[in-house]
Amino acid sequence: MKLRIKGSSLRLRLTQGEIQQLVETGEVQEQVPFAANATLVYRLRRDSKISDITATYTVNLIEILIPERASREWCATDRVTLEHSQRVPGGELRVTLEKDFACLAPRAGEDESDNFPHPQAPPGSRE
């Protein structure tokens, strides 16, 4: 699962396997280790008690909650993106969830074997 942070926006991109994990377990989590026992954890978790995608932050944890119904629909269909803006002090935070497509032009060092096939790729092509 990839996390992109830019300004007042968070974007998570999930591979096919991560979508399957969300279906089976209700969550997907990654972590980034830093020096001196500091680790940033980011998690996407299904929640039956919410009605909109919601992001929270506590010490070293970014958690994005997705409504259970929206999660099940997103995972089971060809829908690529879910988005929501939530109010935060001083403005809005835009949260985007996307299925991660393989690039049209392969990049060195990138394993995209579990990414979704790119919709603009030639027929029969993995990219």
What are these regions (language model features)?
Residues L3-I5, L10-L14, I62-I66:
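Short, structured motif recognition centered on aromatic/hydrophobic residues
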Residues T15-G17, E24-T25, P67-R69, E98-D100, ...:
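Surface loops and adjacent helix of pleckstrin homology
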Residues R13, A55, A108-G109:
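A hydrophobic alpha-helical transmembrane-helix feature that marks the membrane cores
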Residues S9, V23-G26, V32, L40-D52, ...:
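N-terminal intrinsically disordered, cationic/polar leader segments
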Residues M1-L3, I53:
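Residue-level detector of beta-strand structural context in well-folded domains
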Residues S51-V88:
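Mid-chain, well-packed structural core segment of small domains
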Residues V80-E127:
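C-terminal charged interaction modules
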Residues T15-A35, C75-V88:
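Extended intrinsically disordered, low-complexity coil regions enriched in Ser, Thr, Gly, Ala
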